[in-house]
């Protein structure tokens, strides 16, 4: 699912992950963080809205990070939330967050990747936010998602082009693999998946994709 250096990067990044939601010193850093926060906040809001009403539903949060989405959905009434992340540090943060929020009993966080997850399980909603940036084989990811989702899956894909994309490529070049997309590339990626409905929306520095199973 990921290269070793991507996994190592996110293990080291876990402790500082919350910084993207806060103000850091320096005008340039503040601008970069504001830009990324805009995308992150938009996709967070759209995902929670897309899952509503979540009462009694099940959710699989792939690349769950520190559990922001998982815990929020559990707090809103999700019956069961499973969060997967290949970075052990992120899983630890997610478990701590769930405990502090009082929803640990409905959240199951695992140090595991998508491809090792059991195909026989299925969930009402799947979430893949900030994950496709690092997936070298997106078709295989989508194929796996369709085996697991009963209702809707929500994914973000980073936009290629412009200064922010260039800056990310430069910053990540020696740290972990990074995959960016144009709208045309994204449309072509989903073209073979004719059995589902796919909606692609532009949100700041990301494409927000909703995959809906047909009744």
Feature-to-residue mapping (PLM):
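Conserved beta-strand signature within the Rossmann-like core of class I S-adenosyl-L-methionine
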Residues: 150-158
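Short, glycine-/aromatic-enriched active-site segment of Class I SAM-dependent methyltransferases
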Residues: 158-177
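A short SAM/SAH-binding and catalytic strip from SAM-dependent methyltransferases
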Residues: 125-136
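Class I SAM-dependent methyltransferase "Motif I" SAM/SAH-binding loop
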Residues: 63-65
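Short alpha-helix
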Residues: 177-194
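Conserved class I S-adenosyl-L-methionine
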Residues: 1-51
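Class I SAM-dependent methyltransferase SAM/SAH-binding core
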Residues: 68-113
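A short glycine-rich, Lys/Arg-flanked "PGG" loop and its adjoining helix->strand segment in the class I
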Residues: 139-151
């Amino acid at each position: 699912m990921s290269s070793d250096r991507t996994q190592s990067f996110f293990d080291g990044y876990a402790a500082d992950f919350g910084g993207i939601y806060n103000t850091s010193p320096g005008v340039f850093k503040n601008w970069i963080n504001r830009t990324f926060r805009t995308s992150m906040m938009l996709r967070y809001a759209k995902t929670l809205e897309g899952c509503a009403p979540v009462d009694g539903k099940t959710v699989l949060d792939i690349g769950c990070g520190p559990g922001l989405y998982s815990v929020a959905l559990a707090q809103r009434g999700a019956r069961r939330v499973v969060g997967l992340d290949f970075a052990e540090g992120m899983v630890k943060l997610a478990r701590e967050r769930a405990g502090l929020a009082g929803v640990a009993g409905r959240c199951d966080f695992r140090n595991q990747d998508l491809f090792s997850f059991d195909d026989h399980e299925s969930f009402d909603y799947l979430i893949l936010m900030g994950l496709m940036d690092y997936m070298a084989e997106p078709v295989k990811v989508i194929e796996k998602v369709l085996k697991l989702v009963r209702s809707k899956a929500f994914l973000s894909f980073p936009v290629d082009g412009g200064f922010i994309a260039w800056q990310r490529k430069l910053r990540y070049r020696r740290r972990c693999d990074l995959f960016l997309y144009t709208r045309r590339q994204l449309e072509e990626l989903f073209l073979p998946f004719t059995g589902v409905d796919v909606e692609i929306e532009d949100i700041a520095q990301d494409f927000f994709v909703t995959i809906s199973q047909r009744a």
